[in-house]
Amino acid sequence: MSGFRVIVIDDERIVGQMIKAAMEPDGYKVETFLNAEPAFARLREEKFDVVITDLKMKGIDGMDVLRTIKTAYPEIKVIMITAFASLDSAVEAMKSKVDGFFAKPVKIKDLKECVQKLLNRADTTAG
């Protein structure tokens, strides 16, 4: 798993910290952001494999993050997490090609399994 790069965008600092603390011991390189603008700047600077984003945030929300990334960086896997999960938001995310969708509170074990499966699938289709 070593070397995969992950961005977490969530306006709740503790969420990013928890995901980072859970994933880095497994070899992931995780960077956290409280909003989308600096995360987009970072994506322009370096290659990342996965973006985990909150749905409801001030400014650019998770749906806009999803659409922007899928347009500019279609190879990046996007996982959405939200405290406001609804059938409508899940359907909208699926239509926008989200790779994973989780309601908060997220079970870290499930999130890590999703990331691993997405990256394993990407490895087999790339090679």
Spell out what each predicted region is.
Residues 106-116:
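C-terminal output helix
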Residues 16, 58, 86:
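The feature encodes the CheY-like receiver
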Residues 13-31:
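Two-component/phosphorelay signaling modules centered on CheY-like receiver
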Residues 32-50:
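Acidic, metal-coordinating helix/loop segments flanking the phosphotransfer/catalytic sites
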Residues 41, 63-75, 92:
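Short amphipathic alpha-helix used as the core "switch/output" element in two-component signaling
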Residues 4, 34-38, 61-64:
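Acidic catalytic/metal-coordinating carboxylates
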